[in-house]
Every structure is written in C-alpha cells, then in structure tokens.
C-alpha cells in the first residue's frame, strides 16, 4: 500500500503553506522552509529510486493528480484573502476560521509585514509550480481526455501559462534538442538569458501552432476556439479575484507568485535539457534529457524526474516511466539542482564534465 500512499505527500506538503498564510507573521515562511527541508533533505537521506513496481489499482495514483486543482484553487483563495486590508474579510474566510479555532486570524493577518508576505509569495509560487504547473504538464499530455485537459489548463492558468499546453506538447516534444526548440538550453547559455529566450520564443511558438490549428479547422482567430485567448481569460479571472480581495496589492501578489512559478518552470526546462543537442532528423532518445533518480524528487514531481522516458514515450502515464539509469544524470535532486542553476559559474563547474563526456559519446568527431 505504501507504493500508492507515497504520492500523497504532495497534498500534505501543500498544507504547510496554507497554515503559514493563515497564522500570519513570520509563519508565512513556514511552507517554503518545510518544502526545502523535506525535498532537499529527503533526496539526501533517501537516495536513489529506480524501481518500477506493478500497480494493480492505478486509480489510486490518479487521485493525487486530481486533488491538484482543488489544492491550487484553495491556496489562491487563501492568498487572495491574505492580501486584504484591515477590516476586509474576503469571502468571510477569517470569520469562519476564527469561529472554528481559538485564534484571531484577521488580527494576525492585519499585522503582517512586507517580509512576511515575501515568504508566502515564494511558498505559493513553489506550490503553484510544483503542484500546478507540474500536474498540469502531466494532464495536458492526455490530449484525448477532455476533463484532464480542462483541469490541466486551469492549473496552468495559476501561473499565467496559457502557452504551455500548446507549445510544450506540440512544439517542444517535436523540436527537443534542436536549434528550433525554445526550451532547450544551449551549452554555455546563462540561465537568465535562457529564461527570457524560452519565455518569449515559447509564447510566439504557441501562437504559431495555435494559428495553424485554427486555420486547419476553419475557426476564426478571435473566438473561444483559440486556446491562447481562453488561456488568457482563465488567468484574467484570477487577476480579477485578487483585485477584488486586495486591490492593487492583491493583484501584485498574484502576478508575483505567477512570476516565481514561471521562473521555476523555465529553470527546470533549462536543467532538463542543458547542452544536449540533436539533429532534426535524429529520433528523440533517452540521451536527450537529463534524468534524476532521487527518491523525494521523484515522489513530489510525479516522476517528472524520469524525463528521458517521458520524452521517448510522452503519452505514458507517470507511474509507468522507465528510470533509464544509463541516461544522462543530473548531479543532484531537482530542487538542489534548480538552486545551483541560479549561480551560473557553479552550474558550469558541476555540469560541464558530464556534458563533455556526453558529447564525446554522442556527437560525431
């Protein structure tokens, strides 16, 4: 049973961000601290996991995926409430909770300082990236499942990622490793330059792909058939909700966490394919993605870490992915590697020996 229950750590981790938001003050850093301790510490203590267990009840693995959207909705509603000024109680949440627990949630919130909100901003941003964007990624690969696609797009709306479900599935998975792929980092490319290039060019690519689809179907550009426009509208609803709850400050908080979540997504893109090049005519293989078999990273990211297998067989559900122990390996777990990427000289020093070895093996002399 533990092989099923272990994936429910994601909803449990998310509760620490909720608790921090409602307790207020320095507690608003709780979620971020817990996340780093559990994920980085878990990877260090638990080591590697290259197992491929058989699952007789796969529906038990689907539940945490479908819990993601309720978690993100409740999290953003909570964060919107936290943005309210003194005397404001968005949706009556503070009064409701104060009636259930012996704690004055409204007074605690009204005492929050800018430093406290900063902690919540990063905590929410990491959950929106790790739960929202990551699960949205898993679900929007299920292109024939309308419910999964709708869930995935709403999850991506929390980070203003209207383009991702289009460009990632129909662009990145086709052009991975080539010069045409915005989401493949080139050798020696600074992560911050990559962030700008991938964000801008990925968005343009999504528009091109969507326009091509609309023309093929005979649909008008300015219609609800345009997934870019409906994606913008989804995120606009979140913007409106935060503005109602907290005015300009609320809107800043929403856009701030979305920017953090987007940065995390692009850094993950950066480290998953850094320097691994491919000719357009060459088939996509396990050698074109950096893998990780770290246990905790694998659990909290629903096997996104088995990225080589994901690109080789993108329609395969997360629990069926091969660990590919012989594929290029990240030096550490995902969260640790992400932080290292933010320090380019350190990243180059750590990754370049492995990349040079990969080039000798995979590139023609």
Feature-to-residue mapping (PLM):
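Intramembrane catalytic core of multi-pass membrane enzymes that act on lipidic substrates
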Residues: 53-196
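Alpha-helical bilayer-embedded segments of polytopic membrane proteins, i.e.
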Residues: 1-46, 59-83, 95-129, 223-266, ...
């Amino acid at each position: 049973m533990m092989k099923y229950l272990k994936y429910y750590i994601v909803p449990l981790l998310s509760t620490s961000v909720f608790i921090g938001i409602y307790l207020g003050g320095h507690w608003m850093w709780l979620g971020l601290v817990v996340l780093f301790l559990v994920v980085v510490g878990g990877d260090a203590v638990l080591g590697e996991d290259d197992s491929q267990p058989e699952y007789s009840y796969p529906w038990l693995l689907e539940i945490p995926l479908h819990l993601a959207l309720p978690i993100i909705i409740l999290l953003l509603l909570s964060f919107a409430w936290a943005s309210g000024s003194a005397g404001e109680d968005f949706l009556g949440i503070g009064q409701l909770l104060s009636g259930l627990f012996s704690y004055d949630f409204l007074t605690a919130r009204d005492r929050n300082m800018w430093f406290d909100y900063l902690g919540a901003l990063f905590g929410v941003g990491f959950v929106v990236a790790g739960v929202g964007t990551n699960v949205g990624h898993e679900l929007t690969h299920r292109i024939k499942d309308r419910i999964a696609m709708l869930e995935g797009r709403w999850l991506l709306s929390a980070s203003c990622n209207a383009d991702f479900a289009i460009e990632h599935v129909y662009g990145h998975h086709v052009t991975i490793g080539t010069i045409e792929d915005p989401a493949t980092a080139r050798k020696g490319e600074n992560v911050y330059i990559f962030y700008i290039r991938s964000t801008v060019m990925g968005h343009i690519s999504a528009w091109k792909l969507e326009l091509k689809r609309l023309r093929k179907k005979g649909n008008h550009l300015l219609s609800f058939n345009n997934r870019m426009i409906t994606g913008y509208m989804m995120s606009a609803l979140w913007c409106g909700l935060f503005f109602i709850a907290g005015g300009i400050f609320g809107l800043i908080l929403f856009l701030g966490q979305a920017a953090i979540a987007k940065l995390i997504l692009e850094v993950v893109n950066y480290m998953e394919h850094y320097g691994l090049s491919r000719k357009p005519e060459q088939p996509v293989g396990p050698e074109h993605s950096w893998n990780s078999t770290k246990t905790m990273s694998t659990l909290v990211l629903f096997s996104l870490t088995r990225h080589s297998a994901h690109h080789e067989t993108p329609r395969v559900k997360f629990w069926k992915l091969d660990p590919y122990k012989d594929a290029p390996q990240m030096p550490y777990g995902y969260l640790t590697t992400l932080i290292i990427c933010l320090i380019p000289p350190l990243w180059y020093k750590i990754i370049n020996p492995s990349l040079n070895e990969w080039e000798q093996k995979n590139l023609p002399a």
